[in-house]
Regions:
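Single conserved hydrophobic/aromatic residue that forms the stacking wall/gate
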Residues: 1-9
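Glycine/charge-rich, flexible interdomain linkers and switch-proximal surface loops
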Residues: 10-20, 96
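Short beta-strand scaffold segments in enzyme catalytic cores
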Residues: 17-23, 29-33, 38-42, 151-157
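A secondary-structure boundary/capping signal
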Residues: 33-35, 53, 108-109, 117
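Predominantly a core beta-strand signature of beta-propeller blades
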Residues: 46-47
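Conserved, helical-rich catalytic subdomain that frames metal- and/or nucleotide-binding sites
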Residues: 52-101
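C-terminal catalytic subdomain
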Residues: 82-108, 112-159
Length: 159
């Protein structure tokens, strides 16, 4: 009925979702994100975050109010400032990441980021075997650390 539709629209006015996506091309990948879902670039030499979160704590880190380590434990770490659906004009950020053979890109939600350290991600991906096994290990670590949020991850490697 019309009344039910109006209630659904009203009740979902503050709902939104985060996004991180990548498209591979010959020499690398194009990545986009909105919210606090992230992309990481991983090689045997290390792990680098590609994306920036659209969140209260990321702004606090940028302004020097807290450190990146403090942001991981901050009670407001899940307060995002941009999301798809909530704001019809929400802008996604874009990145171009050149890649060499054997390099990885990890796309993941905050459920993984909040429970698995960058060094754990690096170790599991570089030493974990095939891509499916790496992801299984990361999800196992996240769940064993009490992941309170949903945990989603995608791993790609340049061949």
């Amino acid at each position: 009925s019309r009344r039910q539709r109006q209630m659904c629209i009203r009740d979902s006015a503050n709902m939104g979702t985060t996004l991180v996506a990548a498209v591979a091309y010959e020499n690398g990948a194009v990545i986009t994100n909105v919210g606090d879902s992230r992309a990481y670039y991983i090689t045997e030499a290390g792990i680098t975050r590609i994306t920036k979160d659209h969140s209260l704590v990321e702004t606090m880190v940028d302004h020097g109010d807290i450190t990146a380590d403090e942001a991981r434990r901050h009670p407001g770490r899940n307060l995002i400032t941009r999301a798809l659906g909530r704001d019809t004009n929400a802008a996604c950020d874009g990145y171009i990441r050149p890649m060499e053979q054997g390099d990885f890109i990890l796309l993941c939600t905050d459920g993984l980021v909040n429970t698995v350290t960058d060094q754990e991600m690096l170790f599991e991906i570089v030493h974990g075997g095939d891509l499916d096994t790496c992801l299984d290990r990361l999800l196992h670590i996240s769940k064993s650390q009490g992941a309170p949020d949903n945990v989603t991850a995608v791993l790609m490697q340049k061949l």
